[in-house]
């Protein structure tokens, strides 16, 4: 059984004070989570403060990025062991904003994913197509190629720790959302690709999230789709009321 994962990606928002206020509000309304997981991914500067608040709570902690070396002269970067040490269990890998603004290639995303796994972190690896690619009918081959590249040399026994997030680039922060049917079709294509790579039994265990303008008013229909196993939430995770409604989808 795939346990749904709702993850809040706070991007470059929230000071330490703002982050702790938000987490306290989330914890106050969270309750017990018996059939789903929820995590927040604050900016690096707030990780320690948030880690202290969520310890021994149902709310988990993730990071938004890492550098694929354990240590070294890499000014400005953060390593997998540093994230583990601070209390992270998850890390977002290859978000479209990293690919677009910082030139991260499929090969570099693969390095990051394997580094995360090697240090006991669970990567949330992001894939998705642009609007021109979708309009040209290339969405599925683009996305499945990203999946194959991200998972290069990842052994079958590690796939239980991998989460894939399908985020159509044209839907991120725009208010546009893929229809539940379109999202389901892409999730099914991703799962079929996983079956080609690892067999249907392993493919059936991998969680595939949807991301891209996830909101309280569309989460229920998205989560009703058979291959959608959670959500990677941006703007709607920055307010307690909206994120709690998403976490408590019906």
From Swiss-Prot:
Keyword DNA damage: no
InterPro entries, A to Z: Aldolase_TIM, TIM_sf, TrioseP_Isoase_bac/euk, Triosephosphate_isomerase, Triosephosphate_isomerase_AS
GO molecular function: triose-phosphate isomerase activity
Catalytic activity: D-glyceraldehyde 3-phosphate = dihydroxyacetone phosphate
Protein name per the record: Triosephosphate isomerase
Family: Belongs to the triosephosphate isomerase family.
Binding site for substrate: 9-11, 173, 213, 234-235
E.C. no: 5.3.1.1
Pathway of action: Carbohydrate biosynthesis; gluconeogenesis; Carbohydrate degradation; glycolysis; D-glyceraldehyde 3-phosphate from glycerone phosphate: step 1/1
Keywords: Cytoplasm, Gluconeogenesis, Glycolysis, Isomerase
Record text on subunit structure and interactions: Homodimer.
Subcellular location: Cytoplasm
Gene Ontology CC annotations of this record: cytosol
Location of the active site: 95, 167
Xref: HAMAP family: TIM_B
Principal location class: cytoplasm
Pfam name, any one: TIM
Any one GO biological process: gluconeogenesis
Biological function: Involved in the gluconeogenesis. Catalyzes stereospecifically the conversion of dihydroxyacetone phosphate (DHAP) to D-glyceraldehyde-3-phosphate (G3P).
CDD domains: TIM (cd00311)
